[in-house]
């Protein structure tokens, strides 16, 4: 399906571009979100008459997003989660969780603006991009910890005590050493 982009869409094009996309992408994402119009003669004429208004609105939204990005960029947010001794979370931190914390911190963000390659599954400091506008990105720091005290230590730059996972080789050496200390070996039995 051919569509006319009403705003800049990442990896697709700029406002006013006519692009060919898959039908499902257009029907489920671009058209309902107001990001595109079907590329018909009537819609092309309508877009040409409204182009100046759309560009002005886009500039206004971009300037608002830039103002928010200046305040938001570099902010740190703390998320408390349960984790094992190795530092792996019992669940994960998703874009929805981060958006809730950012909103509670006094900023406006929804889960679609938070972009994670994969959910956060370990404690520590994580850099997370927030796409406030197609052309404006702010980076925040998400501090995932087991307790508020641990979060403060992580923020101060201290290394949190995380027990390293034991490998099978380590376990075999430990068992062998314990048997040697006991005076026996596996072959003696």
From Swiss-Prot:
Stored Pfam families: Ribosomal_L9_C, Ribosomal_L9_N
Single GO molecular function: structural constituent of ribosome
InterPro entries cross-referenced by the UniProt entry: Ribosomal_bL9 (IPR000244), Ribosomal_bL9/RNase_H1_N (IPR009027), Ribosomal_bL9_bac/chp (IPR020594), Ribosomal_bL9_C (IPR020069), Ribosomal_bL9_C_sf (IPR036791), Ribosomal_bL9_N (IPR020070), Ribosomal_bL9_N_sf (IPR036935)
GO BP, sorted A to Z: translation
Superkingdom of origin organism: Bacteria
PROSITE patterns assigned to the protein according to its UniProt record, in alphabetical order: RIBOSOMAL_L9
GO CC term, one of those recorded: ribosome
Record keywords: Ribonucleoprotein, Ribosomal protein, RNA-binding, rRNA-binding
Family named by the database record: Belongs to the bacterial ribosomal protein bL9 family.
Function according to Swiss-Prot or TrEMBL: Binds to the 23S rRNA.
Stored HAMAP family: Ribosomal_bL9
Protein name: Large ribosomal subunit protein bL9
Source species taxonomy: Bacteria, Pseudomonadati, Pseudomonadota, Alphaproteobacteria, Hyphomicrobiales
Gene that this polypeptide is encoded by: rplI
